[in-house]
């Protein structure tokens, strides 16, 4: 608790130049992938919904963004995890994917 307070007091906010640069990168990434802000918001909501089925997420520090270099665009999800909700054996398998054993046999 004290460490969090000290971190908040002594952590510098990024300069506006850095913030503007990150926003420009995001705009360029959106343009390259042709994702509208609505689609990105829906994607962010869906990712959080699915991940939340399995783990409890920390609300502070949640971030989903697009990052691009010259050749590729990546969706980056920073999802701080508090704890697991289910054991891995109890977690349901996605309907679109065969169980791990069947996938190896093919």
Swiss-Prot record:
The lineage of its organism: Bacteria, Bacillati, Cyanobacteriota, Cyanophyceae, Acaryochloridales. InterPro entries: MinE, MinE_sf. This is Cell division topological specificity factor. Belongs to the MinE family. The keyword 4Fe-4S does not apply. Gene3D superfamilies: Cell division topological specificity factor MinE. SUPFAM superfamilies: Cell division protein MinE topological specificity domain. The keyword Magnesium does not apply. HAMAP family: MinE. It comes from Thermosynechococcus vestitus (strain NIES-2133 / IAM M-273 / BP-1). Keywords: Cell cycle, Cell division. The gene is minE. Prevents the cell division inhibition by proteins MinC and MinD at internal division sites while permitting inhibition at polar sites. This ensures cell division at the proper site by restricting the formation of a division septum at the midpoint of the long axis of the cell. GO terms for biological process: cell division; regulation of division septum assembly. Residues 87-106 are annotated as: Disordered.
């Amino acid at each position: 608790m004290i460490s969090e307070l000290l971190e908040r007091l002594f952590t510098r906010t990024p300069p506006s130049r850095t913030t503007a640069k990150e926003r420009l990168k995001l705009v360029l990434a959106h343009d390259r992938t042709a994702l509208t802000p609505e689609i990105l918001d829906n994607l962010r909501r869906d990712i959080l919904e699915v991940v939340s089925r399995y783990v409890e997420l920390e609300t502070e520090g949640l971030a989903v963004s697009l990052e691009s270099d010259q050749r590729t665009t990546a969706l980056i999800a920073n999802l701080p995890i508090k704890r697991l909700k289910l054991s891995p054996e109890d977690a349901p398998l996605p309907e679109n994917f065969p169980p791990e054993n069947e996938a190896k046999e093919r």
